[in-house]
Amino acid sequence: MTITAERPSATQDRGAEYLDRARAVAAVIESEANEIEATTTITPRAYQALADAGLFWILVPEEYGGAGLDIVSAFKVVQEISRADGSTGWAFMANSCSTGVAVGFMSPQGAQQVFGGPDKGITAGMVVPAGSGVRVDGGYRVNGRFRFASGSAHATWIGAGFVVHDENGDPVMRPDGQPDCQITWLPKEKVEFLGNWDVMGMVGTGSYDYRVDDQFVPDAVTFETFSTTPVLSLI
C-alpha cells in the first residue's frame, strides 16, 4: 500500500515557526506575570519579547513585514501566550487582531503609513461607534470617550469608532437607512488616557478608558465600520 502525504504549505510552515517563537516568549511572560499584575499592563520586558519575535504582526501580510498567518495558526499563537499569562494573552489578542483588521481594511496608503518601515504599528482601542465625527476636507474631526482599550499601554496607534454627524449635529444616514459609522486610527500621542483600570480579574490587560478631543483623522486611515470586503486579504 502506498501512502501519499501532502507537503505542508508555506503558511503551515510559518504557523509552526511562529508557534515555536510563542513558546520561547511564553517563558519570559510567565516570569513577568506577577509584575504584569502589579502594574496592570504588559511589562517592558514582556512587550520586547513579543515584539522581537514578531508576534504582534502575525495577521499582517508579508508585504508589510508581518507573518501573514491564517486565523487558525494565529490563534494557536494566542493560546500559547495565554497559557503563560491570561492577561497578557488577552491584551496580545486585542493587539494582534485589531492590527490585522486595520491593515486589511484601511487604504494601501494608510497601511503603508502605519505598518511600513522598520517601526511597524501596533494597534489597540475600542472601535464600536461610541464617538462622533464631522466630515472635513480630507477626513474627519473626531470626538469621544472610549472604554476597554486592552493592550493600549504599548500600542502605537489607537482605534476610535464613530458615527458621522452633519453640521447640525444630526447623524448622517446611509442609503440603507443605517447611520454612517466609521473606524479610524490615531497616533497614540493624540489620545488622552484616563488611567482608570482597577479591577479584580484580567488586571494585566491594561484596558484603560481614553478620550479623543477634536482630532483630525485622514481618510487614509479611516474605513467603514460594517464593511465586509477587505482592501487587502491574506487568502
Please report, for each region that a protein language model flagged, where it lies by residue:
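Glycine-rich flavin
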Residues: 44-52, 57-156, 166-176
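Short secondary-structure boundary/capping elements
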Residues: 17, 41-42
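N-terminal capping segment at the start of a domain
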Residues: 25-33
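FAD-binding core of flavoproteins
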Residues: 123-235
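Short, flexible segments with low predicted structural confidence
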Residues: 20-23, 53, 183
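Basic/polar N-terminal segments that are highly enriched at the extreme N-terminus
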Residues: 1-20, 24
